[in-house]
């Protein structure tokens, strides 16, 4: 058996949940390649990651749009947790509002129980008073500034897609048309890029690159709306699971270049 301990039940559960996730991830990674562990330098880099110090403000009013986004985001976060796409404290969701501000999930709040009032409003680079937003807030802000077509961002750690993040095996979405239409040409960036090279990470996204994978870290999916980004997250995990399962049967036959061109033409996909 396994025994874990911490100062409270939440801490102990979080450790156990993470332990189980890592074990399953290693098993799946071994099915497609050789898992790559973090170096001591990378561990120290992650540990030195600073929390963004933002000025605070007190919102004068919460609009009906904002309230609706808060409710929808909680619903999607709970759904992602039930599907094991995120963990109790791992996984960041954000949604841009029509005035350019955005709502983001808080730091260190259990994703299984997060409520609308827990979510954090970021406006003009300032943080809603009395709340602690995700450590990736600046990355979300930069992506929104660089890409007016992006209105929602999700950072997650799903078991199957992460098998590609911890190995040197490339993720290829050309399995079935839906996978390619949703995910197009996913890019892989080095560990730590999302907080040491924020601008470069943000500039990696494009209509043909809606998903970025960070080595030994996470995946980032973007969309025109929260449900659109969530669809991409689900499709990415389903596709990764299919590839890993099929790899045990033989060579995988991907959609060829001519078929890809036809899909791009028929569905008016942009570069």
Predicted segment positions?
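Glycine-rich flexible loops
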Residues: 1-271
